[in-house]
Amino acid sequence: REAKEWDKAIATYQTLLTVEPGKFGDWYWAIADCYERSGRLKEAIRSYQQSDKYPSVYFAMASCHRRLKQYKEALVLYHQARADQSTAAQASIHIAYTYEQSGGRENAIKWFQQTCKLYPKTSHASQAHAHLQTKYKISVTLGGANENK
């Protein structure tokens, strides 16, 4: 994989699926990563779907969907990732960025604010706060209050 010989790496991981099936989640993740790095995003999504690395797989698939401009699919996956408390803040800010990328300014602002309000002590809230100030000129305290400038 390091030499960027993606097809050879994929073939090796596919062989490992039969040789060591107990690690199928790792092998499918590696196959998906090769597809993603080589720009074959639809194939990457299909391989990520075979992996068992949740909730990380939601973020990986959503990233591919965003690169394909399939924003609704990405949003569904980020909302699924929000169900896991350990990744909820990260998923929330990704929802905001996805709306922003798709041209949904109002929803983007709403989700950046939600990230600040729901997860005030996280780095994602700090990032959302800074983004609201710099891009949208909205001042939001990490406690959730806001003031338009």
What are these regions (language model features)?
Residues G25-D26, S56, Q90, H124-Q127:
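Start-of-helix register in tetratricopeptide repeats
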Residues A30, A60, H94, A128-H131:
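Canonical tetratricopeptide repeat
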Residues D33, S63-R66, Y97:
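Residue-level recognition of tetratricopeptide repeat
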Residues E2, R37, R67, Q101, ...:
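Register position in tetratricopeptide repeats
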Residues I109-K149:
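Terminal, low-structured helical/coil segments at or just beyond the last alpha-helical repeat
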